[in-house]
Curated annotation (Swiss-Prot):
Family, as annotated: Belongs to the bacterial ribosomal protein bL20 family.
GO cellular component: ribonucleoprotein complex; ribosome
GO molecular function terms noted in the UniProt entry: rRNA binding; structural constituent of ribosome
Gene name of this polypeptide: rplT
Claim: Ligase is one of the keywords in the record: no
Keyword RNA-binding: yes
Protein name as annotated: Large ribosomal subunit protein bL20
Example of a GO biological process term: ribosomal large subunit assembly
InterPro entries: Ribosomal_bL20 (IPR005813), RIBOSOMAL_L20_CS (IPR049946), Ribosomal_protein_bL20_C (IPR035566)
Function: Binds directly to 23S ribosomal RNA and is necessary for the in vitro assembly process of the 50S ribosomal subunit. It is not involved in the protein synthesizing functions of that subunit.
Amino acid sequence: MTRAKSGKISKNRHKKILKLAKGYRGRANSCFRVAIAKVEKALQYAYRDRRNRKRNFRGLWIQRINAAVRTHGLIYSQFMGTLKKAGIDIDRKVLAELAVNNSDGFASIVEKAKAHI
């Protein structure tokens, strides 16, 4: 029986890793040993930052809402508390979008919330 060296399998694996490492600096885009370490680390960063992105966007929405609410004489925490009392159930993403793109609609929401202070 002849010896099977799995040449095609390892070549395809190398090709896959080097394709993922395309655009990396130095030997990281051409040398398999270096590329596999860099690709593995890049995938770890990608996994971590998919979670961090959710935190970052929530913080951005809060900053935008806070800036818009302060022009109406409230602060963020008061505004969110009065929204809950008023029974207005709009999430932060939509509120931030309204604050940036539809200031009239946001102003009407703030006035409804102010009625429940």
